[in-house]
Amino acid sequence: MPNFPRTDLAVEAEAIHRSAAAVTELPGVRAEETNRRGFSVTEVHVLDAAGENALCKPTSDYYTLALDPLLRREDDAFENAAQTLAELLRRVLPLMPDASVLVVGLGNRAITPDAVGPDAIDSVMVTRHLREQLPEHFGQFRPVAALAAGVLGTTGVESADMIRALAVHLHPDAIIAVDALACAELDRLGRTVQLTDTGITPGSGVGNDRAGLSRDTLGIPVAAIGLPTVIDAGGFSDDPRAEQMFVTPRDIDTVVRDAAKLIGYGINLALHDGLTIGDVDMFLS
């Protein structure tokens, strides 16, 4: 069996497997690129069992948002990126107007490349308690709770167990999980955001798989949003020791901070109709 590069991105997996098979299209897989507000969005649709076998990913739709205009600091790039991310999130997680949502940040805040999830939670508008206590002022907002779940090594509790217990108590209608991913191409490292409704397995990007979060394990829809922050060093070296190493950009602190804010704002715009970036700024200030 070929030794394919490690990646969590469906767009990379599609290209890698298609190239290895020397075909223009994989069976059961459809890929297309669109442009939204000046941002490139690649859609990979795994259609059936043939697609699952070809791509080694569950049947679903995978959206990859390229952040190039934002990284170039183009005018209105942050707002356009956040609005585009919100549109994609609404596609993977359609919700009734008053459906409640639990947003979960996965990862270890103390390790910068793994801090995307916890840092994104800092930019999420938490409204569940406000709706309950001040319905006259916050009744128009969707009930949203948030959790930075931590990691097993610092909490002694599996993230999935913690989230499952909280879900039993809160009864959310859906969960949004944010996590760091691994990619295979330098052009995508810290430069793309992937969204899907298949859920997520914490730690899978670096070969440290934990219990998964999905509709199958939690009983409700689980949307996953991920930013690739590491790349397998084995792709750059023939030294077998490199297979146990991952590399990350030297400006990863800035990359994670900016992307986490974008993801948080995109979640807010997706969950609360009619909000603007200015509204979110004011709420979080």
Locate each region found by the language model.
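Gly/Ser/Thr-rich loops at beta-strand to alpha-helix junctions
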Residues: 106-114, 153, 180-184
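A structural-propensity feature for long, helix-poor, extended segments
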Residues: 139-167
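A structural signal for small-residue-enriched, beta-sheet-centric alpha/beta enzyme cores
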Residues: 147-148, 161, 177-285
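Helix-enriched interaction subdomains in cytosolic or periplasmic regions
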Residues: 55-83
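Short glycine-rich or small-residue beta-strand-to-loop segments that form or flank ligand, phosphate
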Residues: 66-68, 100-111, 146-150
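N-terminal amphipathic/basic leader segments beginning at the initiator methionine
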Residues: 1-59
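Glycine-rich phosphate/diphosphate-binding loop of Rossmann-like nucleotide-binding domains
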Residues: 108-142, 146
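Proline-aspartate-enriched helix->loop->beta-strand connector
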Residues: 167, 172-173
